[in-house]
């Protein structure tokens, strides 16, 4: 029943929610003018450490940072206490598992040059490149995915990894920066 109420609350905030959303705790949502956040069918958003013993440190955060940005989460995807921030576009495929406290972002948040870094006076100084996570990807707990990354379908990224470059489909990747460890034979 609470999930139905939370789905209705998300819809009232402007989130496009397909049927079957399950929530544990309340996610935090930030929409921008002309932006879109969409949740596919049967998504699970776990914002409570009571529902995930891996240690959810904060609620699921779905944030658009600039007008017209998009954040799309595919059908049957489960998220535990992660932050998903889109200045342009973040797209997560179907059947993904995203471990506790992951961060997926398509931007640097601040300018790299010292002038304006603190207050972001010029948004164009902040680097942004779309992020795509294809179907059936598993991101372990505390994984960070940075701007411009594409993760191929059926790939697993080990806990604590920092993904700075795109990864092919069907591999196990780990490390900071994440590197391919091996191919996953049985997919």
Locations of regions flagged by a protein language model:
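C-terminal/domain-terminus segments
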Residues: 148-174, 178
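Domain-scale signature associated with acetyltransferase and cell-envelope carbohydrate enzymes
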Residues: 1-109, 134-136, 143-145, 153, ...
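A short acidic, glycine-rich active-site loop
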Residues: 61-67, 119-131
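Charge-rich, low-complexity terminal tails
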Residues: 125-149, 153-154, 159
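Acceptor-binding helix/loop patch of EC 2.4 sugar-transfer enzymes
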Residues: 107-121
């Amino acid at each position: 029943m609470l999930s139905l109420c939370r789905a209705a609350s998300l819809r009232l905030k402007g989130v496009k929610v397909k049927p079957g959303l399950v929530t544990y705790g309340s996610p935090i949502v930030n929409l921008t003018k002309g932006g879109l956040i969409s949740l596919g069918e049967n998504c699970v958003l776990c914002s409570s450490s009571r529902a995930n013993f891996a240690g959810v440190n904060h609620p699921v955060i779905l944030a658009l940072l600039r007008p017209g940005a998009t954040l799309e989460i595919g059908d049957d995807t489960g998220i535990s206490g992660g932050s998903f921030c889109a200045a342009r576009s973040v797209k997560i495929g179907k059947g993904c598992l995203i471990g506790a406290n992951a961060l997926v972002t398509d931007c640097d948040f601040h300018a790299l040059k010292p002038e304006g870094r603190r207050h972001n006076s010029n948004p164009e100084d902040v680097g942004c490149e779309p992020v795509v996570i294809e179907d059936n990807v598993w991101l372990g707990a505390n994984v960070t995915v940075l701007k411009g990354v594409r993760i191929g379908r059926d790939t697993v990224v080990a806990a604590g990894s920092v993904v700075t470059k795109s990864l092919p489909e069907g591999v196990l990747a780990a490390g900071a920066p994440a590197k391919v460890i091996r191919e996953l034979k049985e997919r």
